[in-house]
């Protein structure tokens, strides 16, 4: 079965295959453009706006807090949230995270996955992404966690997609599980932009 027994169409087949590619492909291996093209993103946004298939396409609503762990340059922080740098202790445990500092700047999803970025409500998951080394990180990379409210953007819960296994897509396309990462962590996808309301850094001045 596809995402919904009533919408197994050519568009839905394309969406299923692209979602699997999105969930199952590390950023290191993304080539030839984002896994989800503009048509697929448009379909997802349309479904979220309509409220249809809400058992699968679940959107974070209201003032729910979302976190994103990243490694960014010193200048990135200085330009957007210098108050976060000023709030760091003069000295101390270099592995200790600061308390969240209020911030107010837009975050634009823009990378190998296109206009989509990964967020989570779980601090430990965000911290792991913020402290994981990557060849794409800036030379002067600083681990940081930015915070936003669900009401400032379009956030899609990825967990419901984990229940889709086997079926015609496994037989015809070798897709055994739509979202191979679905049960490992709580992940939401931000489509487009949001407004950052808080930021945390690790370390001291």
Residue ranges and their predicted role:
Residues 1-117, 123-205:
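Conserved NAD+-utilizing ADP-ribose enzyme module
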């Amino acid at each position: 079965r596809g995402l919904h027994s009533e919408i197994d169409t050519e568009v839905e087949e394309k969406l299923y295959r692209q979602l699997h590619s999105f969930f199952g492909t590390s950023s290191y291996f993304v080539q030839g453009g984002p896994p989800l093209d503009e048509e697929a993103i448009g379909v997802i946004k349309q479904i979220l706006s309509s409220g249809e298939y809400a058992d699968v396409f679940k959107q974070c609503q209201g003032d729910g807090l979302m976190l994103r762990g990243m490694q960014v340059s010193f200048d990135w922080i200085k330009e957007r949230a210098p108050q976060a740098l000023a709030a760091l202790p003069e000295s101390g445990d270099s592995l200790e995270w600061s308390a969240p500092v209020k911030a107010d700047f837009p975050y634009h999803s823009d990378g190998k996955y296109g206009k989509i970025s990964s967020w989570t409500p779980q601090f430990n998951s965000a911290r792991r992404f913020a402290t994981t080394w990557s060849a794409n990180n800036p030379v002067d990379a600083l681990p940081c966690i930015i915070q936003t409210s669900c009401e400032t953007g379009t956030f899609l819960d990825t967990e419901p997609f984990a229940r889709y296994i086997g079926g015609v897509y496994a037989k015809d396309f070798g897709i055994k599980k739509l979202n191979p990462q679905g049960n490992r962590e709580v992940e939401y996808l931000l489509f487009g932009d949001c407004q950052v309301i808080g930021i945390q850094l690790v370390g001291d001045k």
